[in-house]
């Protein structure tokens, strides 16, 4: 038997609600003045801001016997993301973009309720006060900042923002809101310069929470422990860490000797050891703090039998290892220097090299740019002027089929894969190459 909805639902199905404007507690100019006067990192929104950031909205609500609340909640549509149960009153509203209407009690929701339930409902208009506790992080930021930052990198309990210049006057408000609205976050920082140091660390400012920088996190089944201020770590590269480990596993054998020459705290080697059962790994990093964390992570993950750790210049280490070992693969994951580090591999054939590197060439020329620059390092031949060369030069070389064929002949394998866009006109790629005997090719190139 079909059920018909009571006529009262026709008045409220798909109802729209708007923020109530003109209320004294919504003096956002006063709120901005308080925000701009904030002078230190906080763990929550200051008390004198809380009432100014509360908003009253008009809603339609359902009044129903308490016994039916669970039934109604089960049928609640996705748009009703804020659900409050107070006594026998059920309020549902979706918080939407500022100044726009939002849907409450969609037709689909009302139609999905059994008639025995709908007959016991009473729907009426009401108002609902949303305090900062009930509002989202982004909606709070939008009240104060015209174009607020919406995303950050999460590193354990640390939220890492890259704030633009226009956001800096609001940084302590951003930090306080992030700490309060993100339960897992207790420390909020913003980077204040680019990665320029020898060890790829950078300067930052604490803008929210407490200055606690020792991190412990689990990623793809591997536990990492490190001090975020002293080593390089980018959570956005987690997919690439696993992808590279999978690629290496598909390329060589688990008992082959592999050197991770710029390993940081060890993500590639630890994944190879624990996920793919590699047994003969050498890890090296020049940063003493990264080396300390690397040894700790090897111990935490019980990989001591598979990984040997070094703390020295990778070129010196290679000069020692190449004549003494049967090295099968090398990983260079320091993008600014990876291609330069290939110089240590000159004249060494039949070893796979896995590089992470940058290019400013557009996607259709990236392969040729990376081929030219890798060849310059490996062949000791100045074919072109490198990463700062004019794109027109790369285009000319890309059109020179004879030269490209000569370069490709130097390699048994030369593959490139885009990893991510770092910034405008700056891209990160993975290069996989294996060197052939090169003597004849070098002679031709030097003519």
Curated annotation (Swiss-Prot):
The protein's location, in the record's own words, is: Mitochondrion matrix; Nucleus; Cytoplasm
What class does this enzyme belong to in the EC scheme?
transferase
Recorded hits in InterPro entries, A to Z, give: MeTrfase_TRM5/TYW2 (IPR030382), SAM-dependent_MTases_sf (IPR029063), TRM5-TYW2-like_MTfase (IPR056743), TRM5/TYW2-like_N (IPR056744), tRNA_Gua_MeTrfase_euk (IPR025792)
Q: What is its EC number?
A: 2.1.1.228
Q: Mention one GO molecular function.
A: tRNA (guanine(37)-N1)-methyltransferase activity
Q: What is the lineage of its organism?
A: Eukaryota, Metamonada, Diplomonadida, Hexamitidae, Giardiinae
> What is one Pfam family matched by this protein?
TRM5-TYW2_MTfase
Gene Ontology CC: mitochondrial matrix; nucleus
Q: What does this protein do?
A: Specifically methylates the N1 position of guanosine-37 in various cytoplasmic and mitochondrial tRNAs. Methylation is not dependent on the nature of the nucleoside 5' of the target nucleoside. This is the first step in the biosynthesis of wybutosine (yW), a modified base adjacent to the anticodon of tRNAs and required for accurate decoding.
Name the UniProt record assigns to this protein:
tRNA (guanine(37)-N(1))-methyltransferase
Give the species this sequence originates from: Giardia intestinalis (strain ATCC 50803 / WB clone C6)
Question: Which Gene Ontology biological process is one annotated for this entry?
Answer: tRNA methylation
Catalysed reaction(s)? guanosine(37) in tRNA + S-adenosyl-L-methionine = N(1)-methylguanosine(37) in tRNA + S-adenosyl-L-homocysteine + H(+)
| Keyword field | Cytoplasm, Methyltransferase, Mitochondrion, Nucleus, S-adenosyl-L-methionine, Transferase, tRNA processing
From which residue to which does any coiled coil extend? none
UniProt record similarity statement:
Belongs to the class I-like SAM-binding methyltransferase superfamily. TRM5/TYW2 family.
Q: Which domain of life is it from?
A: Eukaryota
Q: Which PANTHER family match?
A: TRNA (GUANINE(37)-N1)-METHYLTRANSFERASE (PTHR23245:SF36), TRNA METHYLTRANSFERASE (PTHR23245)
Asked if Methyltransferase is a keyword of the record, the answer is yes
Q: Does the keyword section mention Hydrolase?
A: no
Q: How does it assemble?
A: Monomer.
**What residues bind S-adenosyl-L-methionine, as annotated?**
241, 285-286, 313-314
């Amino acid at each position: 038997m079909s059920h018909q909805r009571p006529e009262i639902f026709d008045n409220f199905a798909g109802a729209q609600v708007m923020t109530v404007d003109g209320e004294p507690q919504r003096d956002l100019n006063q709120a901005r003045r308080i925000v701009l006067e904030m002078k230190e990192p906080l763990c929550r929104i200051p008390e004198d801001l809380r009432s100014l950031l509360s908003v009253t909205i008009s809603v339609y609500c359902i009044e129903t016997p308490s016994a039916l609340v669970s039934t109604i909640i089960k049928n609640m549509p996705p748009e009703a993301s804020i659900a409050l149960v107070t006594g026998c009153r059920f309020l549902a509203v979706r918080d939407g973009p500022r100044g726009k209407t939002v849907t409450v009690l969609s037709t689909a929701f009302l139609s999905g309720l059994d008639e025995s339930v709908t007959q016991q409902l009473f729907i009426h208009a009401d108002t609902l006060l949303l305090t900062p506790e009930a509002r989202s992080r982004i909606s709070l930021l939008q009240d104060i900042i015209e174009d607020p930052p919406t995303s950050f990198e999460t590193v354990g309990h640390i939220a890492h923002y890259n704030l633009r210049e226009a956001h800096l006057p609001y940084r302590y408000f951003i930090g306080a809101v992030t700490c309060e609205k993100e339960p897992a976050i207790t420390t909020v920082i913003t980077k204040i310069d680019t990665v320029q140091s020898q060890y790829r660390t950078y300067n930052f400012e604490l803008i929210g929470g407490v200055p606690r920088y020792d991190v412990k996190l689990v990623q793809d089944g591997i536990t990492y422990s490190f001090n975020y201020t002293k080593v390089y770590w980018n959570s956005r590269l987690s997919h690439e860490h696993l992808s590279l480990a999978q690629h290496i596993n598909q390329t060589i054998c688990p008992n082959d000797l592999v050197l991770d020459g710029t390993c940081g705290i060890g993500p590639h080697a630890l994944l190879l050891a624990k996920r793919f059962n590699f047994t003969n790994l050498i890890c090296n990093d020049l940063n003493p703090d990264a080396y300390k964390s690397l040894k700790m992570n090897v111990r935490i993950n019980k990989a001591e039998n598979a990984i040997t750790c070094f703390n020295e210049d990778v070129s010196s280490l290679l000069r020692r290892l190449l004549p003494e070992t049967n090295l099968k693969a090398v990983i260079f994951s320091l993008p600014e220097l990876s291609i330069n580090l290939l110089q240590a591999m000159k004249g060494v054939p039949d070893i796979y090299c896995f590089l992470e590197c940058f290019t400013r060439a557009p996607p259709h020329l990236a392969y040729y740019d990376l081929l030219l620059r890798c060849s310059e390092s490996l062949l000791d031949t100045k074919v072109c002027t490198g990463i700062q060369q004019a794109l027109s030069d790369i285009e000319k070389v890309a059109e020179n089929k004879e030269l490209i064929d000569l370069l490709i002949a130097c390699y048994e394998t030369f593959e490139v894969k885009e990893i991510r866009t770092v910034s405008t006109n700056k891209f990160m790629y993975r290069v996989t190459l294996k060197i052939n005997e090169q003597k004849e090719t070098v002679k031709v190139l030097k003519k």
